[in-house]
C-alpha cells in the first residue's frame, strides 16, 4: 500500500515548506497535486478528534524519549489497509503568540512546591501532627527547609524538566482528526480503533496523553 503525505499551506509559504521538508528528508519528492478524496460511493465512515487529556502545559512524550521512530507505529496501521479501505490522519496547526508559556512555568512551580500533587496528603491528619511535632522540636525554618527538600524526587524533577523544555518551543494550536473509510461500519470502526491505538505512544504517566474526543 502507498502512504501519501499532503501539506496544505498558504501560497506564500510553499517555498519555505518545500525547503524545510527536503532539508529533513533529502530523498523526498514534492509535487503539487489536486485535492485528494478518500470517499467512494456507499462507503462507511468512522472518525474522531484527538485532544490532550490534561491541560496543555503538560507535555507529551516526543521522539527524543522513544526507542523507535514514532512514525513506524502510525504507518504500520495505514499499510495494512485493503483495497476497499482508506484512512487519513489530518493535523492542522497554527502558531500562537508568546505568553502561553506562563501557565507552564506556574504549573512547574506548583509541582515543585507540592501544591499540584500533594493536595491529598495535606488532608491527612497524621501529616498535620508530624508537622506540628517537628515544629516544636526543631523550629519552623528547619522544618520548611526539610519539606522543600523532601518534595523534590527524581520523578518530579524529570516532570518539571519536561515542562520547562516544552516552554522553550514554539506554541501551536493543533487539531488532529482521524478518518477511516470502509465498505461496512464495523470495518471502518475497527480501523479507527487501530489508528487511535497508534497514538498511545505519545502518552506519559506523569504528564499528558492524546485521547479521543
Q: PLM ranges: what are they?
A:
Residues 1-213:
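Extended, folded cores of ATP/NTP-driven motor/assembly subunits in large transport
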